């Protein structure tokens, strides 16, 4: 994992969602821990992190339906990192107003994890 000061919002969200969706951790515990760890971030950034994590989890079934409508490989068969990146990005595109449809940080997060 990168140094905390170098992590972007989306990398923090990705790590949190991996813990919750792929490792089965409780969302409220993961989010509490993450928000305490990054309490130095501005409130707007912490709100974005929390809203994106909670929204992705709450809309997971619909998001998976949308992804499965377009993807050759269905979500249950995807690698966990790819599945989580797609869920996070799909949530942002469908539900958040002020997020660009294509975000460089998604690519960067994927590149840093190989």
Give the location of each predicted region.
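Conserved AdoMet
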Residues: 33, 37-97
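Conserved small/polar residues in nucleotide/adenosyl-binding loops
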Residues: 105-114
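Short acidic alpha-helix initiation/capping motifs at coil-to-helix transition points
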Residues: 25-27, 98-104
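Residue-level signal for inorganic ion chemistry
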Residues: 13, 49, 108
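Long, amphipathic alpha-helical "stalk/connector" segments that mediate intersubunit docking
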Residues: 3-29
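Hydrophobic (often cysteine-bearing) scaffold residues that line and stabilize catalytic clefts
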Residues: 9, 45, 82, 101-104
């Amino acid at each position: 994992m990168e140094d905390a000061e170098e992590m972007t919002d989306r990398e923090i969200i990705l790590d949190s969602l991996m813990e919750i969706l792929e490792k089965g951790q409780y969302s409220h515990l993961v989010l509490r821990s993450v928000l305490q760890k990054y309490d130095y971030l501005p409130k707007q950034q912490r709100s974005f992190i929390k809203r994106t994590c909670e929204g992705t989890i709450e809309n997971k079934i619909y998001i998976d339906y949308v992804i499965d409508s377009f993807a050759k490989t269905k979500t249950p068969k995807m690698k966990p990192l790819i599945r989580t990146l797609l869920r996070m990005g799909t949530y942002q595109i469908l539900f958040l107003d002020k997020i660009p449809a294509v975000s460089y940080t998604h690519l960067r997060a994927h590149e840093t994890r190989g």
